[in-house]
């Protein structure tokens, strides 16, 4: 099915019935937004817990180890997401990929995919995203398609960005993208008002207080 044919002028919102992976794609001006939702169901939690390693072959030919659950969740919707992006894309369009928690992990995996298919670096914004790549090849594959505006927001008291702890084989594996730490009030403000007031949460640095 050509999913975007259903929503020529509306956001495309699809829920995967197999792994409960939720995503949405919409276009505003010359920017295409791709958003993945976080953990909210038993199926989502099962994907979080599948923390063994699974191989991914990057577009540059390198092979890297990824979190098996996050890979499974993303691959269940991958073709639909790319199909929708292709149908919305016009020459000159840019991409912003967004995700919270489990959705942040899926956004990380989508970054290499979308960047390679559309031959551009994109803006990646994650909130409370867990670790996805086990090795440097994975880090490099994803970072190759991230532009300088990419950000990784974390609540300093949130344990999720530190998991799975055994994926931290070197400092580069801990975070992909520039980390911004926030207190709970600031994070709530960004999550509820960020896309409207703060251009998806990375435009106003005064919101964030470093607690590292």
Give each language-model segment a name.
Residues 1-17:
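Extended, Lys/Arg-enriched charged tracts that mediate electrostatic binding to polyanionic substrates
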Residues 101-106:
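Active-site loop->helix "elbow" adjoining a glycine-rich segment at hydrolase catalytic centers
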């Amino acid at each position: 099915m050509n999913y975007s044919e259903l929503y020529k002028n509306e956001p495309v919102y699809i829920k995967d019935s197999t792994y409960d992976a939720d995503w949405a794609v919409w276009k505003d001006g010359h920017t295409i937004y791709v958003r993945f939702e976080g953990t909210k169901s038993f199926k989502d939690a099962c994907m979080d817990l599948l923390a063994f390693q699974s191989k991914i072959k990057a577009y540059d030919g390198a092979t890297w180890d990824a979190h098996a659950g996050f890979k499974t969740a993303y691959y269940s919707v991958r073709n639909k997401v790319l199909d929708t992006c292709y149908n919305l894309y016009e020459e000159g369009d840019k991409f912003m990929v967004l995700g919270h928690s489990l959705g942040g992990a899926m956004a990380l995996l989508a970054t290499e995919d979308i960047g390679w298919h559309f031959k551009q670096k994109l803006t990646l914004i994650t909130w409370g995203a867990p670790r996805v790549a086990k090795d440097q090849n994975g880090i490099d594959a994803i970072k190759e398609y991230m532009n300088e505006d990419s950000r990784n927001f974390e609540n300093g008291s949130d344990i999720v960005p530190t998991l799975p702890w055994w994926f931290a084989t070197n400092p580069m594996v801990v975070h992909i993208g520039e980390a911004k730490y926030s207190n709970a009030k600031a994070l709530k403000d960004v999550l509820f008002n960020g896309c409207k007031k703060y251009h998806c949460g990375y435009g106003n640095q005064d919101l964030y207080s470093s607690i590292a």
